[in-house]
From Swiss-Prot:
Catalytic reactions of this protein: Ca(2+)(in) + ATP + H2O = Ca(2+)(out) + ADP + phosphate + H(+)
Family of this protein: Belongs to the cation transport ATPase (P-type) (TC 3.A.3) family.
Protein keywords: ATP-binding, Calcium, Calcium transport, Endoplasmic reticulum, Ion transport, Magnesium, Membrane, Metal-binding, Nucleotide-binding, Phosphoprotein, Sarcoplasmic reticulum, Translocase, Transmembrane, Transmembrane helix, Transport
Name this polypeptide is given: Calcium-transporting ATPase sarcoplasmic/endoplasmic reticulum type
Residues binding Ca(2+) 1: 768, 771, 799-800, 908
Lineage, highest ranks first: Eukaryota, Metazoa, Ecdysozoa, Arthropoda, Hexapoda
Length: 1020
C-alpha cells in the first residue's frame, strides 16, 4: 500500500478489507500470502568457496604469473635429469605465492560481514495478530504476517512489518527508530492521517516501521507493507543494486597490469626473435627445437623479472600497518584498499548528530524573572558551560560566574528538573564516560540541576559516580514523587505530583511540577515566580517570555526550549482520573511560571579546528542531517561550515527544496552546497551519485540501517561505532568514538600512506626495470645467463620486499594537510619520473650484466676470456681455434651469476635509500630517519648471505661464496646508483624551483669526481 501515512484509519482498513475488531478471514490471508509473498527479506546467495578462489585469480598480474608458472612447469619436464630438481623450484615457488595470495583473499572475504545479511537480525521471529479464525490475540511466525493483518504491539516488541496505527491504548506510544533514522530520541506516534504524500520517514508519525522497537506504550495497527515492500526491505533492494567500485589504487594497478602485459609480450617476442639465428648453435645440439625452447625459457625468465611479485604482499602489509595506526586514532578500517582512497578524499559528507555534535543534549542558556512591576519586567539570563552528560560546568550571569544557591528561583527550578523527570545519568566504568538512561531531554535537565547545585551540596571526597547524583539525592530527601502524568500530544507537557518529606521554601503542601512546550505551559500559567514571591502573569508578560523564548529558538543557537512551572495547590489525587490522559490538561491549571531552559546537542569542541584543517587541505565538508533546517544551519555556523553572518542561499537545502529542483539544478546544488537538512536515505545516495559524476572522491558517514546504501555507494563509507551492525558492515571504516575529527586524522594518515606507497611502488618498478634490462642485454649481446628465474623470484619477493615494506614507515611530510587532495586519476608515474626510473633501471641492468662479464673477462679467479669468446659462448662446444684451451663448462660457473645477483641485491638496497624521498637528497633526509629501512636492509643482506653460504640453498639458487676482491667489485658497480639518483633529484629540485639545472651544479660534479678519484686509486 503506497502512501499509507496519508490515508485515514478507515481508508487503510478498507483498502485491505480488514475488520477493525476481528481482522482478516482465512481466505483473505491465503489470498494475500499468494499475492504478496512471505514477510521476510530474501536470503543473499553467498558465493561458494570455489567461486571465491577463482575470483582471486581474476587479476591480470596474477594471470601473467600463473601463465609463467605453467610454462615453467612444462619446460621443467624437458630438463636434463640432473637439473630436474632446480627446474621445478621456479614454478613451485610461483604457485606457492599464488596459493598464499588466494588463501588470504578468500579468508578476508569469508570473514567480511555481509551488510545485506546483517539486515536479517532486525526481523522478529514472532508477531501478535488478530484474525477471524480464533478469538483474541494469537502469536504467529512473523514471516506468515500478510498486508491487511491486524497486529498488536507493546513495550519491548520488535515491529514485524510496516504498520499503519489504528488505535493507541496507552497515554503515549514511543518508538525507537534509531536503526532507521540514526536519531537516538524515541518518536511519539499518533493515529491521525498525514496529508503530505511526500513526507519523509521521520515525519510519518502514524507508521510503525518493520524492525524498530516499542519503547513505551501499546497499540494496534493494520499491516501495509511486508518483506521487500517495507522501509527496511527497500533499503535491502537498494543495497543489492549497489555495485562495488574499485578504489583509485586498484584502478591504477589494473592499468599498470595491462601496460605491463603489453610491454612483457613485446619484449619477450623481441628477445626470442633476436636470437632466432642462435637456435641451431652447437650448445643446443644443432637442434632448432631445443634452441627455440632454450630462448623461450629466457623469455619466460624475462616475464618473471618484469612482474613485481612482491607488490601485492607489500601493498597489503603497508595498508595493514596503516590500519593499525588509524585504529590508535579511533578509526577502524574494515576494507584495506580504502586506506589509500582516504588520501584522495575531496568531499566529506558528515552526519550532524553525534559526529559533529556530542549527541548529548545540554542546557546552554536559561532565564527566570528578575523583577516584575505591572507589565514592566526584566529577566536574569544564565549561561552554562559543559557539552556532555558529565555534570561539570560553570554558571554565568552577564559574563560573571555565579553561585546558583544565591538565587531562590533556581532552587525551585532545580527541584522541577529532578522531580518532573523519569530519566537518569549513569557512569560507564568501561568507557570512563557518563551516559543517559532514558530520554536525552530529561537527562539534560538532570545534568543542569547537578551543575547548578542550588542547595550547595558538598561534593568533595565523592567519587565521580556519587558526585554526579549528589544534588538529586539532596532534592529527593525533600520530595517524594507520588505519580506522573505522562506526556501527551494535546497538552505538550508532562507533570509529577510530589509531596514534601521535610519543610522547604516551597511550602508544606503537595506540588505538581510541570515541564513542556512554552506556548502550552504559559497558556495554563496564572502567576510567575520572582524570587520567593508570586506575581500575576499578564498577557504582556507572557508575550515577553515568548519573545525571548523565540530568540533562543532562532539565530545562532536555535535552542530547544522547555518551560518549567509548578501548581502550588494542585487537585487532590482522588479527584483525578489517572487512566484517561485526555483529562490531564484539566489538572495542570493555575500554574506558576518558574523559568525557561534552552538546550541543544552541542558541537564537539575539536570540530571547529578540524573543519579549518579540511578547508586548508582542499576538502569540502557537506553536512547531511535529518534535523530541521534552522537547527542545522545554527550548528553549521557554530562549527565553521558557514560564517556567522554568511548568506546560506544556494548553499543550504532541505530535502524537499532539493527534490523540487531539476536534475541539472540538483547537480549544481551538490557542487556548491554545504548543508542538506531534513533528508531521506535516498537523498544521501543521490548526493553521492552527483559527486561521483563530478569525479569527486566522497567519504559518507552514517549510523542507521537507512544509511547503508549510501555508505556502500560512496568511495569511503564511514559508520559510527555506536551505529547499527548493518551500517558498520556496509562501511569501509568505523569511527570508534563517533567523532568527525577522527575522519580528518584518518584522511591525513591516508595521504601519508599513499605518499609512502608511491615511493615503494616506484622503487619496486625501477628494480624490475633493472632486471628486465639485465636479461634483455644478456640475450641481445649473446652473453651467458646472468640471472635465472628462481633468483629473480627471490629478489622480487624477499630482498626487495623487505625494504619496500619498510618504506611504508617513512614519516609524513609536514605540509601534508596543506595541499589539495590528489586527483583520483593522477598517475603513479609522471613523464619525468618515468625517465628517472628508466635511467636508474638501465643502470641496474647494465651493472648486473657488467658484473657477470667482469668475472669472465677481468677477474683473477675467472677464465679471463675475450669479449668475442664471451658473446659467442654457445659456439664453444663446436670446437674451433677461437675456443682453444677453454673449458666450455666455465660458462656454467656459478661465480658469474653470484656476482650479478650480489650487485643486483646491493644496488636495490641502495636504491631503497634513494626512495626515502621523491626529491629530497640523502643529506637532508638521511637513512636513519626511517630506522625500519635500515633494519630491513640489514635483514635482506643477511638473507642474501644465507643463500650464498648455506650449501643446500646455494644449490637451489645456483650461487657460490665470493672472495673479498669480488665483494669490493660488487660495491664498485653498486655505489654509482646513489650518485646517479642524487643527480636526478638535484635536477628535479631545480626544475620544481623554476631554476636552471646547471645552476649550483658544482656540488654534483665534485661528488662524481671524488667517486672516480677513489676508484682510480683502488685500481693502482
Amino acid at each position: 500500500m503506497e502512501d499509507g501515512h496519508s490515508k485515514t484509519v478507515e481508508q487503510s482498513l478498507n483498502f485491505f478489507g480488514t475488520d477493525p475488531e476481528r481482522g482478516l478471514t482465512l481466505d483473505q490471508i491465503k489470498a494475500n500470502q499468494k499475492k504478496y509473498g512471505p514477510n521476510e527479506l530474501p536470503t543473499e546467495e553467498g558465493k561458494s568457496i570455489w567461486q571465491l578462489v577463482l575470483e582471486q585469480f581474476d587479476d591480470l598480474l596474477v594471470k601473467i604469473l600463473l601463465l609463467a608458472a605453467i610454462i615453467s612447469f612444462v619446460l621443467a619436464l624437458f630438463e636434463e635429469h640432473e637439473e630436474t630438481f632446480t627446474a621445478f623450484v621456479e614454478p613451485l615457488v610461483i604457485l606457492l605465492i599464488l596459493i598464499a595470495n588466494a588463501v588470504v583473499g578468500v579468508w578476508q572475504e569469508r570473514n567480511a560481514e555481509s551488510a545485506i545479511e546483517a539486515l536479517k537480525e532486525y526481523e522478529p521471529e514472532m508477531g501478535k495478530v488478530v484474525r477471524q479464525d480464533k478469538s483474541g490475540i494469537q502469536k504467529v511466525r512473523a514471516k506468515e504476517i500478510v498486508p491487511g493483518d491486524l497486529v498488536e504491539v507493546s513495550v519491548g516488541d520488535k515491529i514485524p512489518a510496516d504498520i499503519r496505527i489504528t488505535h493507541i491504548y496507552s497515554t503515549t506510544l514511543r518508538i525507537d527508530q534509531s536503526i532507521l533514522t540514526g536519531e537516538s530520541v524515541s518518536v511519539i506516534k499518533h493515529t491521525d492521517a498525514i496529508p503530505d504524500p511526500r513526507a519523509v520517514n521521520q515525519d510519518k508519525k502514524n507508521i510503525l516501521f518493520s524492525g524498530t522497537n516499542v519503547a513505551a506504550g501499546k497499540a494496534r495497527g493494520v499491516v501495509i507493507g511486508t518483506g521487500l515492500s517495507t522501509a527496511i526491505g527497500k533499503i535491502r533492494t537498494e543495497m543489492s543494486e549497489t555495485e562495488e567500485i574499485k578504489t583509485p589504487l586498484q584502478q591504477k594497478l589494473d592499468e599498470f597490469g595491462e601496460q605491463l602485459s603489453k610491454v612483457i609480450s613485446v619484449i619477450c617476442v623481441a628477445v626470442w626473435a633476436i636470437n632466432i639465428g642462435h637456435f641451431n648453435d652447437p650448445a643446443h645440439g644443432g637442434s632448432w627445437i631445443k634452441g627455440a625452447i632454450y630462448y623461450f625459457k629466457i623469455a619466460v625468465a624475462l616475464a618473471v623479472a618484469a612482474i613485481p611479485e612482491g607488490l601485492p604482499a607489500v601493498i597489503t602489509t603497508c595498508l595493514a600497518l596503516g590500519t593499525r595506526r588509524m585504529a590508535k586514532k579511533n578509526a577502524i578500517v574494515r576494507s584495506l584498499p580504502s586506506v589509500e582512497t582516504l588520501g584522495c578524499t575531496s568531499v566529506i559528507c558528515s552526519d550532524k548528530t553525534g559526529t559533529l555534535t556530542t549527541n548529548q543534549m545540554s542546557v546552554s542558556r536559561m532565564f527566570i524573572f528578575d523583577k516584575v512591576e505591572g507589565n514592566d519586567s526584566s529577566f536574569l539570563e544564565f549561561e552554562m558551560t559543559g557539552s556532555t552528560y558529565e555534570p561539570i560546568g560553570e554558571v554565568f550571569l552577564n559574563g560573571q560566574r555565579i553561585k546558583a544557591a544565591d538565587y531562590d528561583t533556581l532552587q525551585e527550578l532545580s527541584t522541577i528538573c529532578i522531580m518532573c523527570n523519569d530519566s537518569a545519568i549513569d557512569y560507564n566504568e568501561f568507557k570512563q564516560a557518563f551516559e543517559k538512561v532514558g530520554e536525552a531531554t530529561e537527562t539534560a535537565l538532570i545534568v543542569l540541576a547537578e551543575k547548578l547545585n542550588s542547595f550547595s551540596v558538598n561534593k568533595s571526597g565523592l567519587d565521580r559516580r556519587s558526585a554526579a547524583i549528589a544534588c538529586r539525592g539532596e532534592i529527593e530527601t525533600k520530595w517524594k514523587k507520588e505519580f506522573t502524568l505522562e506526556f501527551s500530544r494535546d497538552r505538550k507537557s508532562m507533570s509529577s505530583y510530589c509531596t514534601p518529606l521535610k519543610a522547604s521554601r516551597l511550602g508544606t503542601g503537595p506540588k505538581l511540577f510541570v515541564k513542556g512546550a512554552p506556548e502550552g505551559v504559559l497558556e495554563r500559567c496564572t502567576h510567575a515566580r520572582v524570587g520567593t514571591t508570586k506575581v500575576p502573569l499578564t498577557s504582556a508578560l507572557k508575550a515577553k517570555i515568548l519573545a525571548l523564548t523565540g530568540q533562543y529558538g532562532t539565530g545562532r543557537d536555535t535552542l530547544r526550549c522547555l518551560a518549567l512551572a509548578v501548581a502550588d495547590s494542585p487537585m487532590k489525587p482522588d479527584e483525578m482520573d489517572l487512566g484517561d490522559s485526555t483529562k490531564f490538561y484539566q489538572y495542570e491549571v493555575n500554574l506558576t511560571f518558574v523559568g525557561v531552559v534552552g538546550m541543544l546537542d552541542p558541537p564537539r569542541k575539536e570540530v571547529f579546528d578540524s573543519i579549518v584543517r579540511c578547508r586548508a587541505a582542499g576538502i569540502r565538508v557537506i553536512v547531511i542531517t535529518g534535523d530541521n533546517k534552522a537547527t542545522a544551519e545554527a550548528i553549521c555556523r557554530r562549527i565553521g561550515v558557514f560564517a556567522e553572518d554568511e548568506d546560506t542561499t544556494g548553499k543550504s537545502y532541505s530535502g524537499r527544496e532539493f527534490d523540487d529542483l531539476s536534475p541539472t539544478e540538483q547537480k549544481a546544488a551538490v557542487a556548491r552546497s554545504r548543508l542538506f537538512s531534513r533528508v531521506e536515505p535516498q537523498h544521501k545516495s543521490k548526493i553521492v551519485e552527483f559527486l561521483q559524476s563530478m569525479n569527486e572522491i566522497s567519504a559518507m558517514t552514517g549510523d542507521g540501517v537507512n544509511d547503508a546504501p549510501a555508505l556502500k555507494k560512496a568511495e569511503i563509507g564511514i559508520a559510527m561505532g555506536s551505529g547499527t551492525a548493518v551500517a558498520k558492515s556496509a562501511a569501509e571504516m568505523v569511527l570508534a568514538d563517533d567523532n568527525f575529527s577522527s575522519i580528518v586524522s584518518a584522511v591525513e594518515e591516508g595521504r601519508a600512506i599513499y605518499n609512502n606507497m608511491k615511493q615503494f611502488i616506484r622503487y619496486l618498478i625501477s628494480s624490475n626495470i633493472g632486471e628486465v634490462v639485465s636479461i634483455f642485454l644478456t640475450a641481445a649481446l649473446g652473453l651467458p645467463e646472468a640471472l635465472i628465474p628462481v633468483q629473480l623470484l627471490w629478489v622480487n619477493l624477499v630482498t626487495d620486499g623487505l625494504p619496500a615494506t619498510a618504506l611504508g614507515f617513512n614519516p609524513p611530510d609536514l605540509d601534508i594537510m596543506e595541499k589539495p587532495p590528489r586527483k583520483a586519476d593522477e598517475g603513479l608515474i609522471s613523464g619525468w619520473l618515468f625517465f628517472r626510473y628508466m635511467a636508474i633501471g638501465f643502470y641496474v641492468g647494465a651493472a648486473t650484466v657488467g658484473a657477470a662479464a667482469w668475472w669472465f673477462v677481468f677477474s683473477d679467479e675467472g677464465p679471463k676470456l675475450s669479449y668475442w669468446q664471451l658473446t659467442h659462448h654457445l659456439s664453444c662446444l663446436g670446437g674451433g681455434d677461437e675456443f682453444k684451451g677453454v673449458d666450455c663448462k666455465i660458462f656454467s660457473d656459478p661465480h658469474a651469476m653470484t656476482m650479478a645477483l650480489s650487485v643486483l641485491v646491493t644496488i636495490e638496497m641502495l636504491n631503497a635509500m634513494n626512495s626515502l624521498s621523491e626529491n629530497q637528497s640523502l643529506i637532508t633526509m638521511p637513512p636513519w630517519c626511517n630506522l625500519w629501512l635500515i633494519g630491513s636492509m640489514a635483514l635482506s643482506f643477511t638473507l642474501h648471505f644465507v643463500i650464498l653460504y648455506v650449501d643446500v640453498l646455494s644449490t637451489v639458487f645456483q650461487v657460490t661464496p665470493l672472495s673479498a676482491e669480488e665483494w669490493i667489485t660488487v660495491m664498485k658497480f653498486s655505489i654509482p646508483v646513489v650518485l646517479l639518483d642524487e643527480t636526478l633529484k638535484f635536477v628535479a629540485r631545480k626544475i620544481a624551483d623554476g631554476e636552471s639545472p646547471i645552476y649550483k651544479m658544482h656540488g654534483i660534479v665534485l661528488m662524481w669526481a671524488v667517486f672516480f678519484g677513489l676508484l682510480y686509486a683502488m685500481m693502482l
